[in-house]
């Protein structure tokens, strides 16, 4: 069987203060963890192993339990989380049989993620808002942590991370001693992973929003009031790049959410900025973000489909159009309908771009590949009767790393086009 590589071997890490007792309390667990056997030969390196490949254990561990995994012939595979209720039965974490997955393991892995951002990427020089942990990209399948100044927002995508959340909190406190915490899990994830969890704040109340700065532009990050973790730091470099193309131009920000692209554009000297979103709550936050930066933006609550048709019929056109819709689907069987919706909205968006203008279009649907998205855009240009010159293709910032063997982690597609005619 081929060697399995879920993480690099490491030297023992020094325990953060407060974790020593947790390690002693849980030392026996990793000595006596249940063993899960695969039913077929397995030569993969992806950290997910699906239910159909796993023998059902006689005594099923609780969802999110740490287990040892062996092949059909008893050969060691690795150590990870087991969930007999989820489509993803195993989330592999550790390939070294000599390394326990315990509080010290989490402290080391989270510490490495923080050091990547601070010492290699040097993100503190750019912003006080960045992704601390990006799930599989940082070897922590099912965990996302975002930093917004003094507020850490923790999102659980697996029962295993939820079950071991105290280890996670302790490790984060070591790296960010003065941080506030807000943690939650999407209802769909809870149902899929078989656990129940209500949002929790370390202060015991709804957390106060954090004021963040990136590339000199200020925003309010509000995990309790906005979508996902409260702000989309993944678009930081895309916002910055596009903002240098907008001086003196009319800008339309579709699906504007809390105003990220639009606020950048206004700060960088756009002559006019219009933001459209169907969600009044996020528009209220967007107006606050414009006020934070002392810029004027016209925000409109509307469904972009009829709004764009009306704008095109009225001959309204913009120099720069941004289209950044929410995730379309979690289901592989719904990818084709999702692509059809992307096609329809991009075709309409192209109808309000001036000749020679720019279209910045995005997809955060991980199941839609970059190739599929570019093909959709080609067809949108054809049906709209517009010729597209692609200037730049990118994705999320470097604080959202992905493993080459886990393409699902590379979820964001960003395409910047010039509309030639």
Residue map of PLM features:
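Non-catalytic substrate-recognition/targeting regions of SAM-dependent transferases
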Residues: 133-146, 162-232, 240
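C-terminal catalytic and target-recognition region of SAM-dependent MTase-like enzymes
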Residues: 344, 358-421
């Amino acid at each position: 069987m081929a060697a399995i590589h879920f993480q690099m071997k490491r030297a023992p890490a020094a325990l953060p203060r407060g974790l020593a007792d947790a390690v002693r309390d849980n030392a026996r667990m990793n000595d006596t963890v249940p063993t899960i056997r695969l039913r077929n030969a397995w030569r993969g390196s992806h950290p997910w192993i699906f239910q159909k490949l796993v023998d059902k254990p006689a005594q099923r561990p609780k969802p999110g339990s740490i287990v040892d995994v062996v092949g059909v012939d008893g050969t060691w595979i690795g150590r990870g989380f087991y969930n007999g209720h989820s489509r993803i039965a195993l989330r592999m974490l550790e390939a070294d049989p000599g390394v326990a997955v315990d509080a010290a393991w989490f402290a080391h892995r989270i510490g490495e993620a923080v050091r990547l951002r601070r010492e290699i990427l040097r993100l503190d020089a750019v912003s006080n808002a960045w992704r601390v942990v990006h799930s599989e990209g940082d070897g922590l399948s099912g965990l996302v942590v975002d930093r917004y100044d003094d507020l850490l927002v923790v999102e659980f995508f697996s029962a295993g991370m939820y079950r071991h959340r105290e280890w996670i909190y302790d490790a984060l406190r070591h790296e960010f001693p003065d941080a506030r915490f807000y943690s939650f899990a999407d209802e769909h994830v809870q149902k899929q992973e078989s656990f129940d969890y209500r949002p929790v704040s370390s202060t015991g109340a709804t957390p106060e929003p954090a004021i963040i700065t990136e590339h000199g532009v200020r925003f309010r990050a509000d995990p309790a009031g906005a979508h996902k973790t409260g702000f989309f730091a993944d678009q930081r470099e895309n916002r910055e790049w596009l903002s240098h193309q907008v001086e003196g131009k009319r800008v339309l920000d579709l699906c504007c959410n809390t105003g990220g692209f639009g606020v950048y554009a206004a700060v960088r000297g756009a002559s006019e900025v219009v933001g459209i979103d169907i969600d009044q709550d996020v528009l209220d936050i967007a107006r606050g973000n414009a006020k934070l930066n002392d810029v004027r933006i016209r925000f409109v609550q509307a469904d972009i489909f009829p709004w764009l048709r009306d704008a095109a019929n009225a001959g309204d056109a913009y120099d720069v159009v941004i289209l950044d819709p929410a995730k379309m689907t979690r289901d592989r069987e719904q990818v084709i309908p999702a692509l059809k919706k992307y096609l329809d909205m991009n075709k309409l968006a192209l109808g309000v771009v001036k000749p020679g203008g720019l279209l910045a279009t995005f997809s955060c649907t991980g199941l839609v590949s970059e190739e599929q998205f570019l093909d959709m855009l080609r067809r949108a240009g054809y049906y709209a009767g517009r010729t597209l010159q692609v200037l730049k293709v990118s994705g999320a910032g470097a604080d959202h790393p992905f493993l080459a063997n886990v393409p699902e982690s590379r979820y964001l597609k960003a395409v910047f086009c010039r509309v030639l005619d």
